[in-house]
């Protein structure tokens, strides 16, 4: 089945609203470089993989899904697989025999990882097998204790290809051989069978926008929400549209609590950890997206994408643009930068900053999409695939806008991040404009002020000139020369201020005084004339 058909399947079960499952954890390979090596499995140093969260869109009580953590190990290597949600494709119970579906999660193998722990019984390979009777035989608390058990080597099927980098993606599975394994329950007890999945029925505790924590274990919807049936269309051949049960209040829609087949729930799904309020704190919203790596390509699963419907037409947009365009909430940085961009002077007030109109224009919904495909096509394996159909702003940081580029491939969409610098805009908002009589007053004031200043400076300079003349008359010519030397020294001092030293100032003052009073002809000393007469002789 083609990869994009898998996306189409996810559209059926996940395609309406966003519900974020957040978790923190660490997956790694113990002694990944140790000596297990065959033609199929090459010993490879697999890096540790930290996972943050997974986007899901809609899961209802009419679907079957669970969380699982699988671990297979022997002395040479370990296999980890974190299944965050396994979805039923054909309407059968994933806990029964013959069920088929796809596991969306974190794996450290190929997309079609081959597992078969019933090989000794049926001798056949299956893709991502899930065995009910084998898996949940002798259920006990030590199943989730993390105790490492050894697997009998004759039960191990070669993992092909296991030497791949960890990736986040989809793994097909089907449940088989429950009847065959049921006769071997003692042999396949958990002590000898460490590969397991622990199942929990949804919903998970989510963020404050989608309250998935209930007051009771059997309540289909929390207080304030009513149970509704909605029709979900299918894009898979041979699979008809179905009715899904959801909880609805205002604009919020999320899955109703699964309450059917309580006997299976009680025997298989223990303990009740996803529906207890004290566990809700573990599922708080953090980062906006999960960044993953697959076969050397990096991609992002975006949680900020939204599809909004205006006049019956579906547009792709983002949380940032919806909030910005509708003036409901904007990242504080936007308001802060706008506030600092307003400048007021005596001539008026202006705005000099990022182009607000441009930001508003590119956030206006324009990119028409198919609602379901847009919400589930959140994988960006290779950025250059498909035809680019547009871009939507994703975030704003300073003068840089981050965009999500949208590419179309066979009716589905691939997203990748890009960025662009927003232009600076200058707009005069308020300009000072005076009345005619104010201009006349300014003209009169200018003339009066000019005359006043002119008179003040004339009187001041006349007083200084009279003082200097009096000093020279009283002190004589030599005293005048000394005053000039002092004034020169003041100028010298100002020039020396950046690198002032006492020695430099004293030497400069002495040299200047010698030149002014001794070397040149002056009324104080006649050394210059005596030297000149001596040279002439």
Swiss-Prot record:
Q: Name one GO cellular component term.
A: membrane
Membrane-crossing ranges are 459-479, 490-510
Keywords for this protein: Host membrane, Membrane, Signal, Transmembrane, Transmembrane helix
Signal peptide range in chain numbering = 1-15
Q: Where in the cell?
A: Host membrane
Q: Note the topology in the membrane.
A: Multi-pass membrane protein
Q: What is this protein called?
A: Uncharacterized protein p61
Protein species of origin: Citrus leprosis virus C (isolate Citrus sinesis/Brazil/Cordeiropolis/2003) (CiLV-C)
Give the taxonomic lineage as stored in the record: Viruses, Riboviria, Orthornavirae, Kitrinoviricota, Alsuviricetes
């Amino acid at each position: 089945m083609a990869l994009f058909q898998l996306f189409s399947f996810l559209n059926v079960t996940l395609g309406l609203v966003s519900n974020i499952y957040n978790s923190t954890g660490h997956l790694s390979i113990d002694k990944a470089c140790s000596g297990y090596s065959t033609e199929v499995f090459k010993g490879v140093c697999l890096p540790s993989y930290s996972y943050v969260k997974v986007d899901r869109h809609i899961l209802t009580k009419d679907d079957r899904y669970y969380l699982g953590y699988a671990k297979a190990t022997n002395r040479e290597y370990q296999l980890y697989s974190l299944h965050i949600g396994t979805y039923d494709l054909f309407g059968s119970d994933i806990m029964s025999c013959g069920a088929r579906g796809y596991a969306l999660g974190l794996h450290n193998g190929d997309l079609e990882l081959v597992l078969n722990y019933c090989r000794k019984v049926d001798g056949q390979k299956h893709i991502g097998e899930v065995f009910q009777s084998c898996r949940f035989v002798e259920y006990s608390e030590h199943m989730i204790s993390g105790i490492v058990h050894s697997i009998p080597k004759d039960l191990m099927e070669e993992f092909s290809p296991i030497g791949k980098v960890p990736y986040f993606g989809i793994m097909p599975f089907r449940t088989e051989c429950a009847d065959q394994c049921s006769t071997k329950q003692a042999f396949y007890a958990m002590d000898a069978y460490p590969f397991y999945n622990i199942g929990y029925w949804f919903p998970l505790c989510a963020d404050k926008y989608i309250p998935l924590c209930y007051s009771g274990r059997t309540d289909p919807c929390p207080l304030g929400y009513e149970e509704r049936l909605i029709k979900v269309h299918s894009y898979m051949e041979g699979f008809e549209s179905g009715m899904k049960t959801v909880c609805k209040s205002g604009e919020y829609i999320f899955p109703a609590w699964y309450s059917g087949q309580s006997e299976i729930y009680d025997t298989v799904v223990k303990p009740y950890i996803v529906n207890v309020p004290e566990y809700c704190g573990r599922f708080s919203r953090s980062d906006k997206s999960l960044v993953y790596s697959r076969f050397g390509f990096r991609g992002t699963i975006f949680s900020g994408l939204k599809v909004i419907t205006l006049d019956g037409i579906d547009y792709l947009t983002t949380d940032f643009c919806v909030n910005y365009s509708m003036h409901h909430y904007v990242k504080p940085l936007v308001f802060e930068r706008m506030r600092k961009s307003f400048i007021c002077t005596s001539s008026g007030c202006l705005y000099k900053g990022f182009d607000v109109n441009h930001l508003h224009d590119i956030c206006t919904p324009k990119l028409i999409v198919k609602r379901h495909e847009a919400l589930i096509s959140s994988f960006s394996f290779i950025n250059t695939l498909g035809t680019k159909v547009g871009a939507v702003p994703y975030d704003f940081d300073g003068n840089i806008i981050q965009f999500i580029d949208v590419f179309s491939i066979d009716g589905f969409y691939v997203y990748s991040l890009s960025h662009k610098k927003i232009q600076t805009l200058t707009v005069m908002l308020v300009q000072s404009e005076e009345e005619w009589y104010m201009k006349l007053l300014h003209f009169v004031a200018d003339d009066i002020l000019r005359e006043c200043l002119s008179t003040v400076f004339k009187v001041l300079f006349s007083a200084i000139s009279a003082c200097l003349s009096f000093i020279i008359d009283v002190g004589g010519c030599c005293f005048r020369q000394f005053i000039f030397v002092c004034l020169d020294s003041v100028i010298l001092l100002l020039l020396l201020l950046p690198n002032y030293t006492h020695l430099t100032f004293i030497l400069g003052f002495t040299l200047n005084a010698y030149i002014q009073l001794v070397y040149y002809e002056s009324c104080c000393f006649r050394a210059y004339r005596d030297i000149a007469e001596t040279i002439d002789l």
